[in-house]
């Protein structure tokens, strides 16, 4: 079983076409491969502050040697913080991406103590003009956010090598030829349009199968 711990972007792994409740309320968990645990709003940059709730969650699970812990964070950083902070701090956004990712991976390394393989889910392509997001702060154009997402995922994949975390993402599969997001992958929920729809699940499952994480 792959235990998916994350912000609202963990909801897709429930197998249900709707947002899931926050843990400890249970998600729908309709798929045989995943269990989804939404811990509420969180950023990759400040994930260390969520250690108490994440540890409580993990300690509540009956983990076996066949299980995985997967972490799903980073979209909020890309959409709401990195471009904004680049301007505020007058620093290249690429520099902030590296700083954010390094902090994220460092915070995840704490959970190696459970001796369960760790999977890191790379942030998805950002919301697009095809399906406008009106639910909260967002900076930059779709293409700008996707370029940052690409840099974030590239850096994240590299940073996962040393701690031996499995990295997996469908970011590239979500892009149109011009680098914008194919909105068909995104949800149709009122005020959202920035989470994955269950329409993306075949692509997700193929990625996990190719990585040998599911059969």
Question: Could you tell me what each predicted segment is?
Answer:
Residues 128-170, 194:
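Substrate-gating cap/lid alpha-helix
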Residues 148-149, 157, 166, 182-215:
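Histidine-centered active-site loop/cap adjacent to the catalytic His
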Residues 88-99, 140-148, 192, 196:
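Alpha-helix N-cap and loop-to-helix initiation/capping positions
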Residues 79-93, 128-140, 184-187:
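Surface-exposed, active-site-proximal loop segments in enzymatic domains
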Residues 11-14, 77-82, 126-132, 174-179:
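Short catalytic/ligand-binding loop motif for oxyanion handling, primarily in non-cytosolic enzymes
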Residues 119-124, 164-181:
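Acidic carboxylate-rich catalytic motifs and surrounding loops in phosphoryl-/glycosyl-chemistry enzymes
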Residues 2-5, 9-103:
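Conserved SGNH/GDSL esterase-like catalytic core that processes O-acyl groups on lipids
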Residues 113-118:
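A short helix->loop->beta-strand "cap" motif at the edges of active sites that frequently abuts
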